[in-house]
Amino acid sequence: MIVRMWMKRALGAAAIVLVTTACGQSPDNAAQPGPTTGTTTTATAAPSGTTAASDPVVPEKLRFSAKTVGGGTFEGASLAGKPAVLWFWAPWCPKCQREASGIAAAAERSEVAFVGVAANDTEGEMRRFIDERGVGGFPHLADEQAEVWAHFGVAAQPAYAFISSAGEVEVVTAQLTEQELMAKVAGLT
């Protein structure tokens, strides 16, 4: 029992350190654009279950439910059969703050579904970020325990999950410029 409790605390502390250092910057370079290098992983979400002929099969990666900022419920299955972008962010992340206007513009110009997945802060701070950064044009999840992040293998922000209409998922853990984001989005349609 003590060992299990110690392991949970150690893993929790390691996760906090990882997330904190992944988005931190010194004040000297906080206003400069960050590098766009990062990690990309691709997975094909294997369909499971049966559906009616007119309903798309829900890939495993889209089998999740989460609370939205504002208190509603979002079902990942609602994205089945259509291209989508999940944007993983945190309210205090300077890279997320810088890329927010580009995300909003890409979501507005695209037919692809966008969903923000906020973690590592309170719902109140998430709401403030959405309002101040102008990214309220698409749903945002209040993933306070980072469960959706873990479901997609995301450990740091900013990150993206690009989901094809066939359910293939490409996770990119890097800050993207608006042009890089639009190129990725164009590849989904």
Residue ranges: model-predicted function:
Residues 131-137, 143-189:
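Thiol/disulfide oxidoreductase modules built on the thioredoxin-like
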Residues 1-63, 182-189:
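N-terminal targeting signals for export/organelle localization
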Residues 97-133, 144-146:
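Structural microenvironment flanking redox-active thiols in thiol-disulfide oxidoreductases
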Residues 69-70, 165:
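Short, ordered coil/turn segments that flank beta-strands lining enzyme active or ligand-binding pockets
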Residues 85-86, 114, 160:
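Hydrophobic beta-strand anchors of alpha/beta hydrolase catalytic cores
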Residues 94, 104, 170:
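Nucleotide phosphate-binding site architecture
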Residues 75-97:
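Short active-site neighborhood of thiol/selenol oxidoreductases, capturing the structured segment around
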